[in-house]
């Protein structure tokens, strides 16, 4: 047997986030929507075996695109896709709210995504309770029946009343339960704060405004403050429990139109975060309440009312220290799309190429996961030919104290039949491991994403056709904050 001495490779691990060809650090995420069974499970009432198989198929598919993060919706309507003492299991799982499956969906997602080197961001909707009160039946144990005064109905939907402190306290406690009990990368919320306005209907929060005005005279300012307060409280809850967990928001793509605010974007959007959803995203970024923002830019490049390029540049210029990822509307791709720009995946490819030329932008999130499954080669070939050809690590959070990972130890490469078995032991703070592969005799460049072979939470990896005679394998570790350790080489036996 040939034995090589393990050598600590004292090389600077650099990121190349601005490289058009293959950035080593880049967010590549997909939303996994559970509301209305958009992505998972495909319908209520499947067997545990069927639901698990569907989840694993989704993750395998996303991993095949070299995505590195999933944003899993675990609380679409004041319900739970995890073990909760506060809210009932979602009716979109079993068909009946309060009836849980025989496994923990969030834990399975964390375990299976981790094996494939992907992080899990946990996606919650803060206020929504029922999308349609005429169709959705609440569990008898739902908070609604204990505290009906905390809720209101707008259109066909039911919501927590954002105006009450008790609402903020409860939603924050839900976040605390998740952060304490699960090893997640981030807490994530989207654009649904106050609901999108219904023409001719006023949101019925007058009683809350009268009861808890907090010295506000203007209701719109009060509403924005309600959302500010819950964002700040959620941030504080995360820090009190696990300060290394990130908090991200994916808002509607337009903060304000320039016609209303000189700081706004050159857009003519029919709704905006600030004026309609009462979500003052820029304030949250400036106050360090959130770690990243992912504006939903679901318009094409050149769209007259909300141009993707204009908005990407606007958000890049308004990051205020938070990471900025761009939300892409992959769901719009169709050969029968009304807008010709969406009749192929070229639009998504062009958007990715465009934002890679904006150094303030740190990657992408794609809506939604099922598009990677259903669109097949329509999406796969354009992305895998170039943009996502190589694996990328997720960016480090700018606002969280970085945790140092120690290099793995006892890294051994063993040939077994036609395969290679790589094994190692985790060091302190190690959450994931990055396997590199280099041709012998060439410079071992750890800054080049082309040399990343695999990422996983496991401490063992089978490598088909390892070709140990011509390749060197090495390994580093990633901490919770995605901070990379020094690498070491595998000893070949």
Write out the residue ranges for each language-model feature.
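Catalytic domains of carbohydrate-active enzymes, especially glycoside hydrolases
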Residues: 53-79, 181-185, 283
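Aromatic- and acidic-residue-enriched segments that line the glycan-binding/catalytic groove
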Residues: 80-94, 128-154, 191-214, 259-271
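Pro/Thr/Ser/Gly-rich low-complexity, intrinsically disordered linker/stalk tracts
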Residues: 379, 383-429, 482-493
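Active-site-adjacent "subsite" loops/lids of carbohydrate-active enzymes
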Residues: 33-52, 122, 127-181, 275-279
């Amino acid at each position: 047997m040939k034995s090589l001495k393990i050598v600590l490779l004292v090389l600077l691990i650099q990121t190349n986030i601005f490289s058009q060809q293959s950035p080593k650090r880049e967010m590549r995420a997909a939303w996994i929507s559970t509301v209305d069974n958009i992505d998972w499970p495909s319908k209520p009432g499947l067997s545990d075996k069927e639901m698990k198989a569907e989840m694993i198929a989704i993750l395998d598919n996303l991993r095949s695109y070299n995505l590195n993060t999933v944003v899993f919706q675990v609380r679409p309507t004041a319900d739970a896709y995890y073990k909760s003492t506060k809210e009932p299991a979602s009716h979109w799982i079993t068909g009946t709210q309060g009836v849980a499956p025989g496994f923990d969906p969030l834990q399975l997602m964390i375990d299976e995504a981790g094996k494939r080197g992907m992080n899990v961001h946990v996606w919650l909707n803060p206020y929504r309770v029922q999308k349609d009160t005429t169709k959705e039946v609440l569990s008898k144990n739902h908070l609604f029946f204990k505290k009906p005064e905390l809720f209101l109905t707008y259109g066909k939907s039911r919501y927590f009343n954002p105006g009450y402190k008790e609402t903020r306290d409860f939603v924050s406690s839900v976040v605390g339960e998740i952060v304490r009990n699960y090893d997640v990368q981030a807490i994530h919320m989207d654009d649904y704060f106050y609901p999108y306005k219904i023409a001719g209907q006023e949101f019925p929060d007058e009683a809350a405004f009268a009861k808890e005005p907090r010295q506000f005279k203007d209701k719109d300012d009060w509403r924005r403050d309600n959302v500010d307060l819950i964002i700040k409280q959620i941030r504080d809850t995360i820090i009190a429990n696990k300060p290394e967990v990130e908090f991200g928001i994916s808002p509607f793509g337009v903060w304000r139109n320039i016609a209303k605010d000189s700081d706004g974007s050159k857009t003519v959007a029919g709704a905006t975060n600030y004026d309609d959803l009462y979500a003052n995203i820029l304030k949250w970024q400036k106050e360090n309440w959130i770690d990243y923002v992912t504006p939903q830019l679901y318009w094409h490049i050149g769209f007259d009312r909300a141009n993707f390029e204009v908005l990407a540049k606007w958000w890049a210029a308004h990051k205020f220290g938070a990471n900025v990822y761009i939300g892409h509307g992959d769901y719009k791709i169709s050969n029968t799309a009304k807008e010709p720009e969406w009749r192929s995946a070229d639009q998504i490819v062009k958007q990715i190429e465009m934002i890679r030329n904006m150094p303030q932008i740190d990657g992408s999130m794609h809506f939604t996961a099922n598009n990677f499954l259903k669109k097949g080669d329509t999406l796969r070939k354009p992305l895998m030919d170039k943009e996502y050809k190589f694996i990328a690590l997720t960016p480090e959070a700018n606002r969280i104290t970085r945790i140092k990972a120690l290099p793995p130890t006892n890294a051994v490469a063993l040939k077994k039949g036609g395969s290679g078995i790589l094994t190692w032991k985790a060091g302190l703070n190690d959450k994931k491991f990055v396997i590199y592969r280099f041709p012998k005799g060439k410079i071992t460049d750890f800054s080049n994403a082309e040399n990343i072979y695999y990422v996983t939470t496991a401490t063992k990896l089978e490598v088909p056709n390892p070709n140990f005679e011509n390749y060197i394998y090495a390994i580093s570790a990633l901490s919770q904050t995605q901070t990379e350790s020094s690498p070491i080489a595998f000893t070949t036996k």
